[in-house]
Curated annotation (Swiss-Prot):
Main localization category: membrane
One GO cellular component term noted in the UniProt record for this chain: cell outer membrane
Protein name: DD-carboxypeptidase/endopeptidase Mpg
Described function: Has both endopeptidase and DD-carboxypeptidase activities. Degrades cell wall peptidoglycan (PG) to allow consummate expression of pili.
Record-stated family: Belongs to the peptidase M23B family.
Matching Gene3D superfamilies: 3.10.450.350, Glucose Permease (Domain IIA)
Cofactor(s) listed in the protein's UniProt record: Zn(2+)
An annotated GO BP: proteolysis
PTM characteristics: Likely to be synthesized as a proenzyme. The cleavage of the N-terminal domain is probably required for the activation of the enzyme.
Cofactor note: Binds 1 zinc ion per subunit.
Keyword vocabulary terms for this entry: Cell outer membrane, Cell wall biogenesis/degradation, Fimbrium biogenesis, Hydrolase, Membrane, Metal-binding, Metalloprotease, Protease, Zinc, Zymogen
Organism taxonomic ancestry: Bacteria, Pseudomonadati, Pseudomonadota, Betaproteobacteria, Neisseriales
Length: 430
């Protein structure tokens, strides 16, 4: 169980100063008593005002982060966080019957805000439903637990991280608290140049990526905006760029010269001929349900029956009905990449090994769907990542795009430059 105090930088310095002052005063007292003989101390009692900072009492609220274990219910996780049984009962009685509160992944975390009185104030976690992860935010007001999630409470900030590899890149990134989805995306971005597992001690990774905050608590990570890996003294860079014509369809990654970063292991085929991208990968506020959701793939709107093709060579590992995904096909490719094609109306005869471009099914609206479309996912080691980083062809930059890319890259590179030669593990930038 991890505990994160809600302490401002100045309060941290104040408490450190207080601790040092106590040590110095104690040392002075000991020294004076050693020089003075037969002095009997007098006991003096005095009521002191509470310790304050900036005119208000010191905040003692803190976040508790509890990992979900296989087979856990929400009540199990809340109990381990230290929440009182009566509070757990109030939450489960009110919300326990809701389907989304029962969808907990074994590798996720539940965050509990504990107030100064020791009672729980807020609970935050993401549920995992086929194709979407939904933020559940519960807040206690007036003794009553209520759902609480609005755009006004959300803030997206770029996060900068600099990590020097010790024994392994993945281990070093994990110890620096780089989210697993960022680690896997990074692996996919540079897969055409080198393996992340091939980094040695002394190599460095510098990252800038979006982080999503709710009520001041970091709840999720977004896209990698820029990445720099120094491997054996050679610097490799990647910059995320989305042209205006791509709209909400997502961008692509290019090197420092604006060139296509890699061939993405043979992913040079779009999975279908589509009308438009109806929903990109990433976080969004649901317009009806008013909750924050991570859409774990890209939705392509297309007419019913449009052929769906394998986006690269691979092996079909699943073909059938898959919960909210409806009729779905999963294909395992090289470099640990797996793709998923959902809501199909029907399957083709393809089995086992398939070639890139081979028809595997047809667009439909099976499962949890509001109309004909293809939901396309890419995963690395089971973790959904933005398909544009690993499993879709990257277009060359046009002349118009090159100027815009250069300006965007210059800003991102300036932020990465702050990390070079500085032992920083994490910072936020407005």
């Amino acid at each position: 169980m991890a505990v994160f105090p809600l302490s401002a930088k100045h309060r941290k310095y104040a408490l450190r100063a207080l601790a040092v002052s106590i040590i110095l005063v104690s040392a002075a007292y000991i020294a004076s008593t050693e020089r003075t003989e037969r002095v009997r101390p007098q006991r003096v009692e005095q009521n002191l005002p509470p310790l304050s900072w900036g005119g208000s009492g010191v905040q003692t609220a803190y976040w508790v982060q509890e990992a979900v274990q296989p087979g856990d219910s929400l009540a199990d996780v809340l109990a381990r966080s230290g929440m009182a049984r009566d509070e757990i009962a109030r939450i489960t009685e009110k919300y326990g019957g809701e389907a989304d509160l029962r969808h907990l992944r074994a590798d996720q975390s539940v965050h509990v805000l504990v107030g100064g009185d020791g009672g729980a104030r807020e609970v935050q976690f993401f549920t995992d439903e086929d194709g979407e992860r939904n933020l559940v935010a519960l807040e206690k007001k007036g003794g009553i637990w209520r759902r609480s999630a609005s755009e006004a409470d959300m803030k997206v900030l770029p996060t900068l991280r600099s990590v020097v590899v010790k024994t392994s890149a993945r281990g070093s990134l994990a110890r620096a608290e780089v989210p697993v989805e960022i680690r896997e995306s990074l692996s996919g971005i540079f897969a055409g140049r080198f393996s992340l597992d091939g980094l040695k001690e002394g190599d460095a990774v510098r990252l800038m990526y979006d982080s999503l905050y709710f009520h001041g608590q970091q709840v999720a990570a977004g896209d990698i905006l820029a990445a720099e890996v120094v491997k054996g003294g050679t610097r490799h860079q990647a910059f995320y760029y989305r042209s205006d014509k791509e709209g909400g369809g997502g961008g692509n990654y290019y090197d420092e010269d604006g060139k296509v970063l890699q061939e993405k292991g043979g992913f040079n085929i779009e999975p279908l001929v589509y009308t438009r991208i109806s929903s990109p990968f990433g976080y969004r506020m649901h317009p009806i349900l008013h909750t924050w959701r991570l859409h774990t793939g890209i939705d392509y709107a297309a007419p019913q029956g449009t052929p769906v093709r394998a986006s690269a060579d691979g092996v079909i590992t699943f073909k059938g009905r898959k919960g909210g995904y409806g009729n779905a096909v999963m294909i395992r490719h090289a470099n640990g990449v797996e793709t998923l094609y959902a809501h199909l109306s029907a399957f083709s005869q393809a089995e086992g090994n398939v070639r890139g471009g081979e028809v595997i099914g047809f667009v439909g609206s099976t499962g949890r769907s509001t109309g004909p479309h293809l939901h396309y996912e890419a995963r690395i080691n089971g973790q959904p990542v933005n398909p544009v980083s690993v499993a879709l062809p990257t277009p060359e930059l046009t002349q118009a795009d090159k100027a815009a890319f250069a300006a965007q890259k210059q800003k991102a590179d300036a932020l990465l430059a702050r990390l070079r030669g500085i032992p920083v593990t994490v910072s936020q930038s407005d």
